[in-house]
């Protein structure tokens, strides 16, 4: 919520708005974040978040460079945790979402599609 609120937390300002803007911008220049090949298949599958869509890395989060089929606009922030916990922060719309599981391996066949469906449903509901 603090990132969505330009640095304001529940009990007051945590970061300056210009700091939030800076930490949300591409920090790698022309480098893009590709998919990955696992070295530990018991913990993580090989994969890519939204293959075919350009993604870069801010100082804090992955940034999708283009709009995604879920409805998430370009410039939104996201990342994930090893037990299939995914989140996104859409500063343009003022929306954030989180999908938490405790399932291994990472990017398992049910968690990732569940998350994508959740995010898509949120944006479809907002479009009504």
Label every model-predicted segment.
Residues 1-128:
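Catalytic loop of the DD-peptidase/beta-lactamase superfamily, centered on the K-T-G motif
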